[in-house]
Amino acid sequence: MTKQERQLKIKELISGQTVSSQYELLSELKSVGIEITQATLSRDCAELGIVRMYSGDSYKLSIPASGEKNVIKNLIGVEILSIQANEIFVIIKTLPGRASGVASFIDSFENPMIIGTLAGDDTVMVIPKTIKETKKVHQFIRNSISDN
């Protein structure tokens, strides 16, 4: 199975039923004969722009339409508690359980100054491409979550 076929199946599963987590999505993929690792699924979700959104009474994985980016931007802004940088990394503190969604939002910009993000429960580490770009990445993130 090619990457494109796998990602198409992921889109179908997410749009066709309520899937609340990557773990649940991994189980759904396995039930239709697609065996992949959690790391591969995580990369696929980031590439597809999949985010975990609250929908009334529970969370669900979703692929937002391009017009929904501003709605997500506003939600992300509420979830971020602080943004700090040292010489090497940008660290974002979030509400508990929201770091993954914030990291996915940052990844969705596909900014060439950012190699990637690493999310825990309430902390996101943003890794700039070079140390010289850390301040620019810090400012980019601030601008990405603010209307100012």
From Swiss-Prot:
Q: Which pathway does the record list?
A: Amino-acid biosynthesis; L-arginine biosynthesis [regulation]
What GO CC annotations are associated with the protein?
cytoplasm
Where is this gene product found?
A: Cytoplasm
* Gene Ontology terms: biological process: L-arginine biosynthetic process; protein complex oligomerization; regulation of arginine biosynthetic process
The primary site where this protein sits is cytoplasm
| Keyword Zinc attributed | no
Q: Where is the signal peptide?
A: none
* Keywords, sorted A to Z: Amino-acid biosynthesis, Arginine biosynthesis, Cytoplasm, DNA-binding, Repressor, Transcription, Transcription regulation
**Keyword Cell division assigned:** no
Which GO terms label this protein's molecular function in UniProt? Answer: arginine binding; DNA binding; DNA-binding transcription factor activity
The record's comment on protein family reads: Belongs to the ArgR family.
Cited PANTHER family: ARGININE REPRESSOR
Say what the protein does. Answer: Regulates arginine biosynthesis genes.
What's the protein name? Arginine repressor
Task: Identify the species of origin.
Answer: Chloroherpeton thalassium (strain ATCC 35110 / GB-78)
Gene from which the chain derives: argR
